[in-house]
Amino acid sequence: MRRAVLWDSSAILALLDADDADHGRAVAAAHHIVAERRPSFVTNYIEAEAHALLLRKLGRAIARQWLLTGGLPVLRVLPEEEERAKAILATHADKDWSLCDVISFAVLESRGARMAFTFDRHFRQYGRFEILGLLP
């Protein structure tokens, strides 16, 4: 799983929304992931978050189509990863990270993955993963 890439909802939205400010970088990063043949995944938390985000920003047809045919494997979060996520929140009380953010951090750590495709600055704040998408 070390080569695997977690796709965050911010990257999914940027890739699908041609009007998104990060669309060009999202397309380039997605091409890079494919060219490198990196396995990709979302968590069940990201799947739910991305669907809600797409529904709000792009409408029900696109949200439904992505949910039913998104093509990314969905990795189910384990109870111990949920507990680790809560511990991360508890030890970083000065951050405004969402539960979905810290679930992603916990899953990346526990599964040995080192890369996230995201435009969410919270991943950089946590500082433990290689980030595709965000500018330095």
Briefly describe each language-model feature range.
Residues 9, 101-102:
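Conserved glycosyltransferase catalytic-site signature
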Residues 121:
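Short, ordered loop/turn segments at secondary-structure junctions
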